[in-house]
Amino acid sequence: MNEVVAKKYVKAILSDVKSNELNAFVENLSELAAAFASDKFKSIISLPTLKASQKVEFVLSLVKNQDAKFANFIKLLGANKRLELIPAILDEMKIEQSLLENTYRGEVVGNFDLSAEQLKALEENFSKKFNSKIKLDGSKSDYNGVKVELDDLGVEVNFSIDRLKSQMSEYILKAI
């Protein structure tokens, strides 16, 4: 339910904010969304004894570089008692921003560390394939192989060493 409401707010923001203001808007939302990681912050936002205007003042005090549009947006969220939607709005905003800029983020997961050159080569190849700018982050996990996930594009490419071993043994058994 929150995602649907967040999408409506994002649509309204995008119709009013110019492209050069969009990055600042996303940065401000990122600062606020980071505050939602704190349980104290969440409890302050959800306190029924605080007035909406006090909550809005508190939230706006956390943002360093705010403009009038951003302040009005936060005031609107506060008046509608939807300040807790800020992280969901940020997620939707990042998705829309990546669509507008044709830039997507992904993750490379494997049981070994990839060098910066390897990541860059993967980024270039995927960028050519999808005619977009792809930025990949590498992470190490228990996965026995390599997996590239581009969630925004709905793409997952994986190579499993275990699967390769089983397919090779099947092929050898069939050949015999």
Curated annotation (Swiss-Prot):
The keyword Ion transport applies. One of its GO terms (molecular function) is proton-transporting ATP synthase activity, rotational mechanism. InterPro entries: ATP_synth_OSCP/delta_N_sf (IPR026015), ATPase_OSCP/dsu (IPR000711). It comes from the Bacteria. Pfam families: OSCP (PF00213). It is found in: Cell inner membrane. Keywords: ATP synthesis, Cell inner membrane, Cell membrane, CF(1), Hydrogen ion transport, Ion transport, Membrane, Transport. Gene3D superfamilies: N-terminal domain of the delta subunit of the F1F0-ATP synthase. F(1)F(0) ATP synthase produces ATP from ADP in the presence of a proton or sodium gradient. F-type ATPases consist of two structural domains, F(1) containing the extramembraneous catalytic core and F(0) containing the membrane proton channel, linked together by a central stalk and a peripheral stalk. During catalysis, ATP synthesis in the catalytic domain of F(1) is coupled via a rotary mechanism of the central stalk subunits to proton translocation. HAMAP family: ATP_synth_delta_bact. NCBIfam families: PRK08474.1. F-type ATPases have 2 components, F(1) - the catalytic core - and F(0) - the membrane proton channel. F(1) has five subunits: alpha(3), beta(3), gamma(1), delta(1), epsilon(1). F(0) has three main subunits: a(1), b(2) and c(10-14). The alpha and beta chains form an alternating ring which encloses part of the gamma chain. F(1) is attached to F(0) by a central stalk formed by the gamma and epsilon chains, while a peripheral stalk is formed by the delta and b chains. This is ATP synthase subunit delta.
